[in-house]
Amino acid sequence: VRGLVDSNPIPGLRGLLKIPSSQSKAVLTADQIRAFYRALRAYRGYPETALCLRLIAFTACRPGEAADAEWSEFDAEGKLWRRPAAKMKARRDHVSPLSEPVLKLLEELRPITGAGRYLFPHRSGEGFTTPNRLTYAMRDMNLGERTTPHCWRTTFSTWANEQGFRPDAIERQLAHVESNRVRATYNKALLLNERREIMQAWADHLAALAHAGSTSDAAN
C-alpha cells in the first residue's frame, strides 16, 4: 500500500535471501551408484568415456576438469593431481590427492592415451573430449532424469558431511571458494593429509557399493 513506508526495503535484502536453484544437482542413492557400476561393466562404448566417468566419481571433480585433464598434471609418485588456475572455476591452482583406485585407473588408461597430451582426447584427434559426451553416456545408464556427471560432487559432499569429516577439508577438495573473506584469508592450508584420508574412504565406499552382489573389479 502506498504511503506506509518511506523507501523500498527489497534492495537491502538482496544477498540475504537465497533463491532455490532449478539447476540443483541430484544426490545419487546407494542403489543408483550400484546401477552406475553395473552399467559400466556392461558399457560397450569407448573405454576412455567409462574411465573418465570413473575418474569423476572417484575425485568429485567438475566434469570439465576431467574432460580436459592432461597427463602432465598428474604426479603418480606423489599421488597428486595439480590443476592450474587457468582451468579452475575459482581461478586458483588446485591440488587434489589421488586414492589408490585412481592410480590404478591411470595405469589402465596410460596404454590407451598416454602417448598424447590429454587423458581423454577428442575422437577427432584434436583437443579433448566434451562434458556433453560424458553427460549423454551417464544418462544412457537410465539412473534417473536429473542424473549427470556433476551429481558426483553433490553425492560426495553429502556423504563426506554425513561421515563427520571437517567441512573445511570437504570444501577444499571440491575447490569451492570461501565466501567469508576473513575466513578465506586464514584458511589457505591445502589440508592434503586430511583430504587424502577422505578420498580413500570415499573410494572404499564406492568400491563396497560397486562390488555388492558382484565379483567384478569395475570400481578398482
Give the residues covered by each predicted segment.
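Basic, Lys/Arg- and aromatic-enriched nucleic-acid-binding interface segment
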Residues: 5-68, 77, 88-92, 112-113, ...
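Short conserved catalytic/interaction loops centered on acidic-Pro-aromatic/His motifs
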Residues: 1-8, 168
